[in-house]
Amino acid sequence: MGVSLVVTSLLYYNIGKQPQKEYAMPTEYEKMIAGEFYKPSDLELRALAASSREKQWAFNAETDRLKRAEIVKSWFGSTAENVAMNPQFVTDYGVNIHIGENFYSNWNLTMLDVCPIRIGDNAMIGPNCQFLTPLHPLDPTERNSGLEYGAPITIGDNFWAGGGVTILPGVTLGDNVVAGAGAVVTKSFGDNVVLGGNPARVIKEIPVKKD
């Protein structure tokens, strides 16, 4: 046997003896937050949703604003120090919501967070606003199978939403964006704009004062 053949044989022998790396299958939660098809009936997700509902009930029953803020800080994926939220508040899981400093929301905020919702500093959210990340298949066979998916929402600093604003899945907004009352935001926009209408469009640009 030639030297090269011996070396090659030993190489393949040693490779075969190496422990094979195990690749764990993604959980339904991991698939969900990645925007892939997932099963909302998964036991882990059902338990997470049940835990979120307990916090939701506690939050909505609490009359002290500081205690409500503490519930939010123990519930959301991340928050800053200054959080002020009025009831009623509705969410799926809560753990996929990330809010910055000086976050304020008025009555009846809905944040459905099958995918991450990220909002920067100094946000002011009017009453009856909705941030919706869930999506359902258009094909009826897929939809009836129970599979769902979603897309994240990302919003920059200094966001102001008037009453009844809806932000749909996959939207990214820049800094200093104002969404006028009743706006339905279906696509992404950059910095320093006022949005209005259904679907929302740029009404005007905002001149920003420089320091």
Language model regions located:
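Terminal amphipathic alpha-helical/low-complexity segments used for targeting or macromolecular assembly
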Residues: 1-82, 199-211
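Flexible, glycine/small-residue-enriched loop-and-beta-strand segment within the central core
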Residues: 89-99, 104-173, 198-211
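Extracytoplasmic/periplasmic beta-strand context in beta-sandwich domains
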Residues: 171, 192-193
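Conserved G/P- and acidic residue-centered "switch" motifs that form tight phosphate/ATP-binding loops
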Residues: 179, 197
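Short helix N-cap motif at coil->helix boundaries in the Bergerat
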Residues: 187
